[in-house]
Amino acid sequence: MKLINGLIFRRIALFCFVLSLSLSLYSRTGGNMSSAENKKSRYKIAACDWMILKRQKIGSFQLVRELNGDGVEVDMGGLGNRDSFDNKLRQVHFQKLFKEEAAKYNLEIPSIAMSGFYSQSFVKRANYKELTQDCIQTMIAMGAKIAFLPLGVECDLTKNPEIRSELVNRLKVVGNMAQEAGVVIGIETSLDAKGDIKLLKEINSPAIKIYYNFQNPLVAGRNLYKELKKLGKNRICQIHCTDTDDVLLQYNKRLNMNKVKETLDKMGWGGWLVVERSRDKNDPRNVKMNFGMNINYLKQIFQNETF
């Protein structure tokens, strides 16, 4: 009976999402009005291409347009044990193709992600400068101003404090590279706000900022809203505005998105909110339901859209 009820709920949720999206698109003129409005919006909503199962795939733009997003955070491609990212955007042909597709669907590319460093160690890679330069060149080619660099499992400073000196030195180096290129590298850490501020002071680079992820303080039991205020608007370059995979954002009882907006408004922060997770644990691969409903929920709160 529970299984049947779960299936019925997911079908109803998907139907409601499709209906709301259809009504939303009906009220627009080919998406052009939405694009013009969103360029003026203080907050814009994007999705990670690797989480919608479209890592460096041209189809990510059409899909995000269908999901009602404003942009796509494009990944550098897989890393694993390779010497370099599996990055097709080194080629001018693909750069042109991706930019044309983004323009076709009135979407932006706010950031380029090095998600490979979730599992790979930034402090153990001898060629970290080459990997970072590859990302910076891709950013310039695609018109993105922010890079996402997660300090993942092996660079977790709370569990591996002994790597701190080497990590800081490397971030100083890539910070200089980013500053020269006129871009920003956003780092995701497991530290609290006080720890992030201390780390940024040690790095001492205007081109290294915090790419904040709501999931980290929520999992650790910290006060998300107080942390945002403590960090302040100038230290946060971009936000992954989701929690772990369990329930959709609108059903998440430990994440009050209205309070998040109120906090960010008072801080004077504005920018891109990127949907990474918060998928329904019972149907995690249902991209259209999970990301569509989460994006629409965020648009209701941050862009005052109604569906």
Each predicted region: which residue ranges?
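Bacterial N-terminal signal peptides that target proteins for export
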Residues: 2-13
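Bacterial N-terminal signal peptides
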Residues: 13-24
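Active-site acidic/histidine proton-transfer and metal-coordination neighborhood
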Residues: 22, 101-105, 118-210, 218-219, ...
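Histidine-acidic metal/acid-base catalytic patches
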Residues: 28-46, 51-70, 105, 193-307
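Conserved beta-strand positions in the central sheet of alpha/beta enzyme cores
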Residues: 73, 111-113, 148, 186, ...
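Glycine-rich, proline-tolerant flexible connector loops at the mouths of alpha/beta enzymes
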Residues: 75-99, 151-159
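A short acidic, helix-capping loop that chelates divalent metal ions and anchors anionic groups
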Residues: 80-85, 118-122, 155-160, 219-221, ...
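Charged helix-capping and loop-helix junction motifs
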Residues: 88-95, 125-133, 161-171, 223-229, ...
